[in-house]
Amino acid sequence: MKWLIFGNKGWIGSMVSKILEQQGEQVVGAQSRADDESAVEREISEIKPDRVMSFIGRTHGPGYSTIDYLEQSGKLVENVKDNLYGPLCLAFICQKYNIHLTYLGTGCIFEGQNNFSADEKGFTENDKPNFFGSSYSVVKGFTDRLMHFFDNDVLNLRIRMPITIEQNPRSFITKILSYSRICSIPNSMTILDQMIPVMIDMARNKTTGTFNFTNPGLVSHNEILSLIRDIHKPNLTWENMSREQQLAILKADRSNNLLNTDKLQSLYPDVPDILTGIREVVSKMKFQQ
């Protein structure tokens, strides 16, 4: 099977490409920019892929490792181009050629109560975005809504706070380990080592529609750091700060929410819950002593 990957050189795209190649699949890295519809259509016509996957998007840039990059003056065009127009071009063109598209979107488009608990249902795939605290989330929220028009053609996966066993500046665990102060709030999160194989299986099976693509349940920053301290780094310390203190040092607010994973679990009941998954990840991580 031939897979055309947009964003194959990025963090997640390169991980997916590597796993596909290990599975014996033919992987082609897209040369066209997703926002150049003519070039995309030419490339798809020439490559004739069986599947297309999109890992494009703008979450950081020079001088910024977070979405605060998009709060700078003059970044609106880049935000809309990379986080809305490009993905929509791919959806329209793949629909035209009857090719299954997997789009890696985000669940950072909702805001729950700060004190929500694991016994709450969380936001479902049909809920409309209610978080507009950052330029990133505003644009991605409307992209998510538009992807619902492609329910029969596109697999729209909402990930959150992605985590990997291997430390990487993009991984949520690596990020919070670099912070001296933490605003610890329970959240839905996605463990990529456990979820990428599920993503590939869904694409291979031509599953379509929107899915909350997180490990079931909630985990807080403090719970993750406590596990790292207990297993690897007994001298690890950190300071907590309030949501108000966090807002004072950020250019934009951050989404905190619980995503309902019933739909995903109906197809993949063995996806590990987030607490079990985090314990497995932390136990396998390597740290310099």
UniProtKB/Swiss-Prot annotation:
Lineage top rank: taxon: Viruses
GO process terms (BP): S-adenosylmethionine biosynthetic process
One Gene Ontology cellular component annotation held by this UniProt entry: methionine adenosyltransferase complex
Gene3D superfamilies: NAD(P)-binding Rossmann-like Domain
One GO MF term attached to the UniProt entry: methionine adenosyltransferase regulator activity
Protein name according to UniProt: Uncharacterized protein L780
